[in-house]
Amino acid sequence: MIRISHLKLSLLAWMLLGVLSVHAQDEDRMFIVYDASNGMADNGAQTVKCTKTGRMVISTIGHINFYDGSSFVHIDPKEENVYQLSKYRGHYRQMFDKHHHLWLKDKNQVTCVDLMMEKFVPRVKDIFLELGFKKPVNDLFTDVNNHLWALSGETLYGLDDHKEFKVRKDAELQDINVFDSRVMLLFYGDGSVSAYDLNTGSFLFERKADTEEEAQRYARSSFVTPYRQGYFQIRNASANEAILRYFDMQTRKWKTVMEEKYHLNSMEFRDEKLYMGCAEGYWIYDLKTSEKKHITKLALSKSRFMTTDVNALVFDRQGGMWIGTEKRGLLYSKPYPTPFHIYGWNDPESTHYYQLMEKRLPSSAWKNYTRPINNIFHDSRGWVWTAMYTGLKLEKTKGGKQQIFTKKDGLMNEMVHSIVEDAHHDIWVATSYGISHLFIKNHDVTRVETYINKDNVPRESFVNGMAALLSDGRIVMQSQDYMVVFDPDKFHNKQEELFPLYPKMTKILVNGQEVEPNKEVEGHVIVNKAISRAKEINVNYD
């Protein structure tokens, strides 16, 4: 048996990428839709979170889904996994604690996932007992430090801090947090906040809602998130109304930011902006200028748009945006805008671009070739590129050595239809599935990158020979139903520097059998934790 510690395997792993330095502008975002057809347990996403390791965790009704960058897996709770919370009236709320647990609250109940095993905890009560807490738990919270707090009766207990605070009898405790590791804040359903010294437990101050009408109007649910020297709070009404407020810890005053005639569902910060999911798309609040922007239509591929509610909105470690909807799937927008613009034949722009392309096509574009050749292109170096049924052929000198580029070199498809050279003398080819970019440096092809339907490239064949470089540096290619236009200089990968990666292994097979934690294979346990958390893998060898 061999023990492999601190694995650095890439061929066996599905990788999650690290932080990128390029960000998509909000108006340029294009979304990809994931749903049950992609492996999710359902077509709606109630909550979405990015773990510290970079993995996405999505709750659908009755399930927890994990996404590893290429596929979904989900786990299902059993009846005995559910713990009743008599004082929680809200909807789905996902929380992480400091003990590698994921907690999911929803309407008077909570479940717990052990992230080290990626399984539901059999009995939630056992977690409380392990933390030394034996009283019944009526509601559960986590603070900014991921410390657990349990409401039992009229007392809030810190399961990690070992502190306790009396709560008001005349108001519903809806949220809590800790400011600057020294002030305990209790947020109530009537819009008030009470502050206590975290260490001594002494009362510091209380601030109520601005008016009694406001206090009663938005009493249905509360969601609080820290920002600098204060807290943003969403308060929803039983009717379709909501208010966003900010509490300044220095002035100890509330400020109303916005009120809407529908529910606000989530908050996330990115690039000095506050993003809020709502019943009609999402809002962006500029924290520097106080400007507000409402995004009601979400752009999809092929010039389509979606109007939907947004239950949850988060950003991953790369800066990609994830949106959870009630019934229309999980939406993802890349951290950089798609450079591909497509125009269908019913769009007047398609005729415009066809005419521009037609004027700049080489004479070889119009020739009819016999199989297995679709097109031949001569670049500025005198190299001859041949688009074939079986790949892309390069001949640098007549009668010289030939090089064939296929799927093993980075093409997604080997039926090549058209070829064009950009202003920097790189080569772009259109295939029956995707557009590929061949980077050329020091008189050689250094790498190949391919773009497909997820990048807004039409998922269809392209027309033989129909590709041209325009005078402004853009490239036009013709597919069966679209004109595709893009600027090579707008691509995030034009920089030669590599982005930092944060690989995470999520699956391993032994003799074709998927390995699970604590599951024996040929008489011994290979991993004792979930693959994504494993630091040792034990396998037999000859």
Residue ranges of model-derived segments:
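Bacterial Sec-dependent N-terminal signal peptides
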Residues: M1-M30, G320, W383
